Amino acid sequence: MENPIVYSPVDAGKIISDTAANLMKSAATSGWAKVKKYFKDFSAEESIEIGTAFNDYIRVTQERNSKIKTLIYRRVPKDIYSFYECVGLRLEGKVIKTSNVSDVLKIGKKILVTGTGGIGKSILMKHLFLSTIKETEYIPVLLELRKFNGMENKDISIYRAVYQTLSDNGFTLADEYYKYSLEKGGYIILLDGFDEVNRDKLKKVQEEIKSFSDKFEKNTYIISSRPTEMFIGWNDFVETSVMPLSKKQALSLVNKIEFDESAKRAFYTELSRTLYDKYTSFASNPLLLTIMLLTFSNHASIPENLNEFYEEAFTTLFNMHDATKDCY
C-alpha cells in the first residue's frame, strides 16, 4: 500500500517573487532587440519610439496575464505561478511537456489544445503567453474568441482583432509594419475558447482562423477548446489533449492553495490516502479538485453518493466558474 504523502506548507510568496523577477528580468533585458528583426528597417528615431511601445506592450500584457481570480481567490487576483501546475499535452500516445513553450512549438505551426471543462485550458494559454515572453524571440498575442460574440458576422476579423489587441496595449503600428511582421512570422497567436463562440458566429470565426493562419502561415497558432467534431476538417492543425492532474500534481496544487490550513491539511491527507484513487475523474481536474476542497471544508468529508456531491457543489460553483473562467 502506498504511503500517504506528507503535507508540507508551501512558501507561495517566494514562488511568486522568484518567478515574477525572472520574467521581468527576461523581458527587460531582451524586449525589442529580439523581435526587431520581424519589422522593416526603421530610422533610429522610429526604432526607439516603436521599441518603447513594444516594451510597454510586453509589460502591460505580462502583468495582466500573470494574475487571475479563481473560485478560491474571488476578490483579489493571484499570481498564477503561486498555484499553477503545468499539465502535459497528449499527442498520439506521447506526452508533451508545457513548462516551456519551446517544447510545445516543436509540435508544429498550427496546434489545437482540447480538454473538458475545468481542466485548465485558459490558464495554460496564459502560461504559454508568459513563457513565450521569457523563452522565445516571438511576439505573443492572446485573444479570447468569445469577444466576437458581441459583433456582427461581417465585423469579425482575426486580422483586425490581433492588431487591436496590440494597439489597445500600447503597441500601435502602421498597417504596413503590422502586415510585414505577420508575413515574417513574428508571432505566437493564442486563440482561447473556440467552444465559447456562439453558434451563429462559429462558422465565421472558423473561416477567419483558417484563412488568417493560411495567409500568414509562418506564425504559430495555438487554439484552445473543448473537443468538437468540427476540428476533423481542420486538416493542417494538430490536435492535442490536455492531460489530467497526476496524484502528485493534485496534491501539489492543494498544497499551494491559500486556504484554511486545518481544513486544507485534513483534505490533503484524505486526498493522499483514498480520495484521489477513489474519485480520480474529479481529483484529476483542477476545477473539480477545488470544488472537492470547498465541499470537504464545509462538510468535513466528501459524500459517498456522488449525486449528492453534484447537488451540493456543481450548480453554484460552475456558475461562479463562468464568471471567472480563466482559471480553476
Predicted regions and their residues:
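P-loop NTPase signaling cores
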Residues: 3-326
